[in-house]
């Protein structure tokens, strides 16, 4: 039987690790300086544990893990455009780091971009858990199957819903 409370906790830790890998100078999930390799190893272990919990029949965990990690540079590139869109689109933004640390929309979008890649790999449950977690934090509800291009910015996003077919 799956302990869903523990699964959610693991998912939150995974997101923290992935954000630390994507933006090591902004986020630090391990609360002290660690190398990119150490962060990646911890995130890979965390993702493997989650996949082992949610799959009834063991798939190729390594394929899912390797594919997600191979997509991280592209996710980072797209998130950089999202940060740029917020910075340029909101006159109140004083710097890019402020967008990453203080804007709820960036949190929702960054979690969505990770969840979307897992959704495309047909990973069950985890992508939706991620975006619902973002929804609970930010008030922004983005379905993991939604198609969202680069330079995406939501200003004052409470109550925004983006469905898979929007």
Please tell me what each predicted stretch does:
Residues 1-132:
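Terminal amphipathic alpha-helical/low-complexity segments used for targeting or macromolecular assembly
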Residues 134-166:
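Structural signal for interior beta-strand "rungs" in well-ordered beta-sheet cores
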